[in-house]
């Protein structure tokens, strides 16, 4: 992961106008999934955009501006929202947000523990045979939503796909690095011509508006709310953070593999995890969904090969600004689902391709039964459970819901830790993080 890739690491060489266009491209890439979470949970779309932008900027501050990651709405907590506030009941949503804020706090605690005890003790559980299939699974599980969106109008979706491919493969100069914007514009135009776009919400929306109201935040509930319900929300939702932490490591692995820079070493896992946690706490306090590093934007990095985090920060500023203009937010919301699905198919496929490359570059030997079983279980559980929904179980009076990716990733980590591993099996694994284990094997043989 530490090998420099051929790409643009300093976008200032392109000039500010082009950086702005690239920032807009990242905003378009994340928009569809980011606004879907509040649509499913009943939270505010404008607040979601504001705190996606502010959360991303906070993440960049905490990671020293080194990680080109955008933070958008996390789907992992949808089950938690539904458990506390079924059908998006407005008066119960602040309680769910308190539970999500507690999960963000757990992220912060875990990041401090990693800093205290050293991240090598954590990363030894995440060699390429684990992270590679997890990254592949991230892309493949996301692709289900892309196909669902494409099903609304395959003609519109195919235009987006073809334009993205043509721009990326045959484009020159600026055209080559803005395939997503070109695909969105072409597909959106076709959809508008055939009457697939309803501009009524745009015409009715005001130009300026506040993204959230105080009654939607958690503060009134913290002062005068039901203490028992707050406790229930915390113990129901907080454990989800343990599963999403594994997904976070997969996301950072994907970004590291894409850019050729080891972000586990610099700025460190404790900083990226802290960034996710603080962003989630901030968003939840003001009635927005939990934040997480977004795979869509990793796909954009892989497609355009522009790796400068400054471009992501421009996208974050745009997201925050758009949240204060209901009219612009409505305009972007009119983007047809098929357009979002078309570009997403390419982006999610790029994520899975990064996972395959991770396995190849680290020379993981899949002819060995141990490696094959680990990869098979991660992929089988992640994708299989994702298509059936999620895994739900009850502990006492608490209902816990885990995504397929969380179950698959945790199963792979457990198998990797438990299955016997001989010295020769370390070939191609992450040498820095596995060095301690290699020394343990040598010591055991001496004994």
Model-assigned labels for residue ranges:
Residues 43-48, 65-77, 122-131, 176-181, ...:
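Short, non-helical or kinked segments that cap or interrupt transmembrane helices
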Residues 1-21, 199-220, 257-262, 418-447:
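Intrinsically disordered, low-complexity non-transmembrane regions of multi-pass membrane transporters
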Residues 91-201, 316-429:
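Membrane-embedded alpha-helical modules
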Residues 2, 31-34, 162-167, 178, ...:
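Juxtamembrane interface elements at the cytosolic ends of transmembrane helices
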Residues 6-17, 39-60, 66, 236-309, ...:
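Membrane-embedded helical hairpins/re-entrant loop segments and their flanking transmembrane helices
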Residues 81-88, 168, 297-312, 318-323:
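Interfacial segments of multi-pass membrane proteins
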Residues 22-55, 60, 67-92:
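Transmembrane helix-boundary motif of multi-pass solute transporters/channels
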Residues 17-30, 156-160, 178-179, 211-251, ...:
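Hydrophobic, membrane-embedded alpha-helices of multi-pass small-molecule transporters
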